[in-house]
Amino acid sequence: MSFIEYTLQADSLYIGERMKGNIFKPCIKTIPYSQISGALNTKFGKNDFKAVGILNTDSEFNKINYLIYSPRDRNSGISKIPLQVEYLSNVSGRVFIFENEASNNLPQECQIFLGGLKSKGFGRCILTYSKRITDITPREGILNIRLPIVEKDTFNIRKIAVPVYGYLFKPVPNTFTGNYVLSLFEGSKVIAPSFLLRR
Amino acid sequence: MSNELIPELHDCLKLTTLQHNFSDFDRFLNYAPNTRTWKGVIQHHCKIPKQGEEAFPAWPTDRETFLLHIADGFASGFSRHSQSYRGEKSFTVHKLWNPKQINEDLRLQKDEEIIELLNFYSKDPSFEDLKARYRHILISRAEDAHPGMNITSLLTHMILTGKFYRVFKFSKIFQLAESEIRSNVEDAFKLTVNKSREWKIYLARLKFSFSQNPFRVRDLNILDLLKETTSEINKLFPDNILFASSNEILMFYDDHKTVMDKIRSIAASNRLYFSVEYSQRPIEEIKKPDPASLSGSQTENIYPSLPETIFPPICEICQMALSDKIWPTDYHAQFDLSETSIEGTEHLCENCFQIRSRPSRLRKLSKWTEGNADVLWLKITLDYECLTKTLQNLYYDYLRKNNPNAKEKDAEIRFSLIYEFQQDYDAFLEQVSNDLLQVFGNGSLEIVMNDLFCIKTGGYKDIFKLLHLFENHINIFFPEFQKLSNGPIRFGIAHSRAKFPFFEIWRELKEQVCDLLIVLTEHGIIKTSLKYIDNLLAATEGSYRKSAFYKLAEISKLSEKLAELKFNDRSEKTDFEDYENLKRNLLPMGMDFHGIVTFIKLLED
């Protein structure tokens, strides 16, 4: 079992939480399995990419910013109530791609689109090859990623001591819909490879 | 003789200057009460004297006194561990976190005072009666006067003995027949040893959480449910709880299944989940107040049943269940009202719908939200793991002051110390709450929980009022913690509009790792330590030119990197002098540039 690590950089990124504070749309401070795997599948026309991502915690990166915009109903031409959107700027993170058939022949550098508000210029990310990870020795720590429970073996998560559960969206292939699957969220106490844990 | 033995009252002679083993009691024999409690006072020790030692006059002779003896040993065993050096006894409590609090030795010395105490005991008083009359002695008298062991009060010891006694007495698992109790001290001693090995108790640490992401005032009802959960558990198991904060409980019990079933049912009815770390060990092995430190510890996570898959729509608040309600349509429908809300609709699950449907007691916050006022959220958090480590370090330092040869392993933290701390911590929270009321007034303060407050604010300057208040209270209650760069008590302050979704604030406050956090929503974060609270307040009093800070704050809105260049740029000498002045105050705190810019925004207000 091995992984390929890519660095991720973007000017601005909005990965929305599903909950919304009425007119406030918060963003996630991590890169969930569903988002990054989906983005890679879309980019390379596959459906079996398995990847997770984390955002750097250095204070100069991943600054929280706010954008106010008013979505417009295209049919009626009327603007709706303005929304305040929370997004990250000067985004820097790391992406860990499970090595399988889909991940063969990945380029050294590529561009993917992640998250929402793409039409407003958000989510253009540059992935740059960093290294191959073969040391996946698990140790106890606090999980730093979000991934579906069914994928825990793929990422060598051996034990879930104290879980923080949530649900991630899983699209149904060839449709515009999907389901929510039980997932493990950041903050869970687990035994897992170091690169998936908080420092 | 009266009918009831009050276990808390067993250490009567410790309130006096008489010897605990009754060796100088003869002249008061005529005043000795004839109650079961007094029998407990006389018979709660079972010690075979070593050579040259004075023997105790009696030992347990029935089930009650034997249980009292075990409970007393269990309660005192937590702080009375052996040390290999001798020194002068100290009969007053030394608070590890507050050594400057000097207690007077108030023990009763005069014969008439002691006779009065014995007469009081003859009236068969309750523990409440004893506290009402002799509280001043109970809180100042150390449970153990041996050098280095005077770190807990007699009051704490009495309370713990009472708790253990009642749990043993009413346990269906711990069996003790009257026939097992023999009439000689050697057999009574053997029985103590056997029962301490035979009786196994559970020590458990529970932590309650919720999945909801509250964003409207009524969603904060989940915090009321959290409070109700801990208070219901406290009511149900008053004798089993050894430590409790707003979301954590440390408790001991004899029957895991029965206790957990009850707690599970309380948590589930309040829509909470919890993790429990527990271990079952013989009484003689349980010493540290942390189940994780005991062998065979296990962790369970008690969640409500979670489906593998949820079909859309999912609840927008908890994101953990199918949404089958629409807010506010379904809420209004309950009262046959047509919808009048101008706000959008939200898809909620049954649980979150019920929580939001509960009337909120936070009426002031609700008004502030309508008026879009600015508020300060204040959360005080106690980190239990950090607390035990900190107390251990402080205890080690204290032992070394008494004896330079003391070893780190001697400085073991026991339950009695944690319980002693809890009493000061609760008093501290109450004092903070009272002072907030005084400083900001009832109209501007919403007490959400005993450690979470919301204050209507006129600007950032109120943050400095809070910092002054903390500095003052930490100094009064826990001055030793102020010397630490990462102490167990954490203060989180967040400034935002009242309308700003609470879950964003909550996310910052609940994951707080530094012990002083200031969040200016949409403007930045300051992470520092209580150790530097003086420096932070001193930095606010420096004389700076406002224009220099204004420039920096405005540039940082465009680019923080550019602002950093400006901050270090020597070409504009006047601005640079102001920045240097600020640097001198803030850099020793380890504050990064982002923190400095946030601090400048604070000063700008």
Residue positions per predicted region:
Chain B
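Regulatory and interdomain segments flanking nucleotide-handling catalytic cores
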Residues: 1-605
